[in-house]
Design a protein with these regions (language model features):
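Active-/binding-site microenvironments in catalytic and ligand-binding cores
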Residues: 1-238
């Protein structure tokens, strides 16, 4: 990804916005990408004392979206406005998050299809996550049963498709209603849909693998009660 530095945020940390980016900003329960921005043209491409024309790289430690701008928090001095940079996403971290995010959608689909129980919340890190569901109580033998069902779904290698629907159509789709598409702000007129074909369909803005087998393996680490009608699963992807 090659982009031009467009703005700089003032504050405790150095953050820059670009005219385009391939970095995923924290949102929808998925953490941000990491990586580097390398100055390749313009002010700062080579500093005094550098070897001839040496490029300067800045480590990206956080990515946040505010309004229309995506802010990349970096270590080091921000390049001048108009500087051209190359962005390199940490693919190992990104792919682990893709696998994890898809696994969470598989889990939601399996639990709905088997028990008709909706998800109430969740959070993820690379290859680990927690998900909360409206169980009260958890069924007997739930952890081993859901682990088996999710791994079977992974092995079936369901294809994953991404599409965009007008909001007026999305809010009438039964699967999207179940996954609370109506909670998306009304200012969003086009809804991005991630469909694990034949298993689960959700409005979602995150990153995913191309088919379920790419996820790997799924393991339930722990179940917890977070109160009446709210049970938590902690899981790992291998």
């Amino acid at each position: 990804m090659v982009a031009r530095r467009a703005a700089q945020a003032e504050g405790e940390h150095t953050a820059v916005a670009l005219d385009k980016t391939a970095f995923y900003a924290t949102g929808g329960g998925q953490p941000h990408d990491a990586g580097t921005l390398t100055v390749i043209a313009g002010s700062g491409a080579g500093q005094a004392g550098d070897t001839a024309g040496a490029a300067r790289s800045l480590v990206v430690t956080d990515v946040r979206k505010e309004g229309e701008l995506v802010w990349h928090t970096v270590i080091g001095e921000a390049p001048a406005e108009g500087t051209i940079v190359r962005g390199d996403v940490d693919w190992d971290r990104r792919h682990k998050l893709m696998r994890t995010h898809t696994a969470m959608h598989i889990l939601c689909g399996v639990i709905w299809n088997e028990w008709q129980v909706p998800v109430t919340g969740g959070n993820m890190e690379p290859l680990s996550a927690r998900m909360d569901f409206e169980f009260d109580p958890l069924p007997e033998g739930f952890a081993s049963r859901v682990e088996k069902l999710v791994n079977e779904a992974i092995e079936r290698d369901y294809p994953i498709e991404v599409s965009f629907l007008p909001r007026a159509d999305a809010v009438l789709d039964a699967d999207l209603i179940r996954t609370k598409v109506s909670l998306i702000p009304e200012t969003v007129k086009e809804i991005r849909v991630v469909d694990i074909v034949g298993l689960d369909k959700q409005a979602d803005g995150g990153t995913h693998v191309r088919s379920t087998r790419e996820v790997g393996t799924f393991r339930v680490v722990k179940t917890e009660s977070k109160g009446k009608g709210n049970k938590r699963l902690r899981v790992e992807i291998g």
